[in-house]
């Protein structure tokens, strides 16, 4: 599954483009900035600072999503290990393939 989300910002007549792609839980961040002005004047410092601020906010949001993903997978792994220990403590016999499946799930 390949998901691409696009977000566009218009800041003081400067066009900002952000592309975030997700491919099988592998996150890739690509940042592209296009500055379009009518009179080709240089970018004011305040506008540039605002654009950098937007980039930092997006990266922080992206890292929070990764943190939630890691946290959920860690909880799932702990639950599967607890289930495996519970089965072993009750002397339930199963094949190595099934035990591997329980650990992986």
From Swiss-Prot:
GO biological process, one term: meiotic cell cycle
Organism superkingdom: Eukaryota
Keywords: Meiosis
Biological role stated in the UniProt entry: Has a role in meiosis.
Protein name: Meiotically up-regulated gene 52 protein
Organism phylogeny: Eukaryota, Fungi, Dikarya, Ascomycota, Taphrinomycotina
């Amino acid at each position: 599954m390949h998901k691409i989300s696009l977000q566009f910002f218009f800041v003081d007549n400067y066009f900002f483009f952000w592309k975030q792609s997700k491919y099988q839980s592998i996150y890739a961040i690509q940042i592209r900035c296009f500055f379009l002005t009518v009179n080709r004047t240089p970018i004011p410092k305040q506008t540039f600072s605002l654009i950098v601020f937007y980039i930092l906010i997006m990266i922080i949001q992206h890292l929070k999503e990764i943190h939630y993903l890691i946290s959920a997978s860690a909880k799932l792994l702990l639950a599967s290990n607890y289930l495996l220990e519970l089965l072993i403590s009750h002397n339930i016999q199963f094949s190595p393939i099934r035990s591997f499946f329980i650990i992986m799930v």
